[in-house]
Curated annotation (Swiss-Prot):
Listed Low complexity bias regions: 73-88
Entry's Gene Ontology cellular component terms: extracellular region; plasma membrane
Pfam families, per the entry: Macro
Transmembrane segments: none
Location of the region described as Disordered in the Swiss-Prot/TrEMBL record: 73-93
InterPro entries per record: Macro_dom, Macro_dom-like
Macro domain: residues covered: 179-354
Name of this chain's protein: Uncharacterized protein Rv1899c
Length: 359
């Protein structure tokens, strides 16, 4: 491994891999080609990951590359790759090879297809390998590997992941830079998705119910969940009621495909709700999902039905609560919504959070 890092510094000082929006990054990715048995020709064109990005047909994440441009990196001894006008070339399908040239750093993100989520990979001049991080930081190396094919890359990733986790979660050898210089240290590792879907039919570890404090599921989504779950769900709810505003409790899911239903109290029986209650209820739901060992969770739009809370505001508050959450077992949150307006609201809230994280 030491030889790999030395090789990376000697032959590929410019090739740095990271996750967009401050997600896990590896500063010595350049040596991966040598470690995986690939050749190292001029530049970094032989990297398995870059080859996967260049060959769009092989890389399932290629279609989700966001439009942006490549910019020169401030790397000593390298010359930026530029177009005829002297400006940096765009990272479109024809210009993806520029990612392999010395001195070029990509500013795009490659997102997992089918999500609006926060998991992404890219190239970046940061070196947060030396920054202490939380144990959850390794979650997205697996997501990254699923976006790139090739058995050699997968074998190398496993070795790479173990080494990076040990290095990045100890204070030994840590960089003297303050943690705040590592973009995204406070960004949640949870993958976010938005779907127009019937929450009672989702095959996830847990789904949520926007409930009242008495856990009487009489109207809206709560009534639909109670009907789908069967009488056992209401019986368990009655046993655990009442609960406080912003609190969450779990019951079994009854006849639904999920394992649990997490009931979050967003209002008194028949009463209005507020932004503070929605934020607290979302945070309590996420904590409860971690307590139950859930990896996947469906959230409904809290407070926007009987509670009458504005949809855009609810989306912003709920997405913000998920991004601030430091997950234990939770890896994936699906916002299960009804209607185009709700889908647009939650998608916009997720995108706004990603844009803020990149800045």
């Amino acid at each position: 491994m030491a030889a790999m890092r030395a090789h990376a510094r000697r032959r590929h000082p410019h090739a740095l891999m990271s996750r967009a929006a401050g997600l896990p990054r590896l500063s010595w990715f350049a040596g991966l080609t040598w470690f995986a048995g690939g050749s190292t020709g001029a530049g970094c064109a032989a990297h398995p990951a870059l080859a996967g990005l260049t060959a769009g047909a092989r890389c399932p994440a290629y279609a989700a590359i966001s439009a942006s441009t490549a910019r020169p990196a401030a790397t000593a001894g390298t010359t930026p790759a530029t177009g005829a006008s002297g400006s940096a070339r765009p990272t479109d399908a024809a210009g993806m090879a520029d990612l392999a040239r010395p001195g070029v750093v990509a500013t795009h993100a490659v997102r997992t297809l089918g999500t609006t989520g926060s998991r992404a990979i890219g190239l970046c001049p940061c070196q947060p390998l030396d920054c202490p991080r939380s144990p959850q930081a390794t979650l997205n190396l697996g997501s990254m590997g699923r976006s790139l094919d090739g058995p050699q890359w997968r074998r190398a990733r496993v070795r790479l992941c173990g080494r990076w986790w040990r290095r990045s979660n100890t204070t030994r050898g840590a960089s003297p830079r303050p943690p705040s210089t590592c973009r995204g240290d406070n960004v949640s590792m949870i993958e976010l998705e938005v779907h127009q879907a019937d929450v009672t039919k989702l095959e996830l570890d847990a789904i949520t119910n926007a409930a009242n404090t008495r856990l009487r599921h009489a109207g809206g989504v709560a009534a639909a969940i109670a009907r789908a779950g069967g009488p056992e769900l209401q019986r368990e709810s009655t046993e655990k009621a009442p609960i406080g505003l912003g609190e969450a409790v779990e019951t079994t899911a009854g006849d639904m495909p999920a394992r649990y239903v997490i009931h979050a109290a967003t209002m008194e029986l028949g009463g209005p709700t507020s932004g503070e209650i929605i934020t607290a209820a979302t945070a309590a739901t996420l904590r409860k999902a971690d307590e139950l060992g859930c990896r996947s969770l469906a959230l409904v739009a809290f407070g926007t039905g009987v509670g009458g809370f504005p949809l855009d505001d609810a989306a912003r508050l709920m997405v913000g609560a998920v991004r601030r959450h430091r997950p234990g077992s939770l890896q994936r949150v699906v916002f299960a919504v009804h209607g185009d307006a709700a889908e647009r609201a939650f998608s916009a809230a997720i995108q706004a959070g990603e844009d803020t994280a990149r800045r």
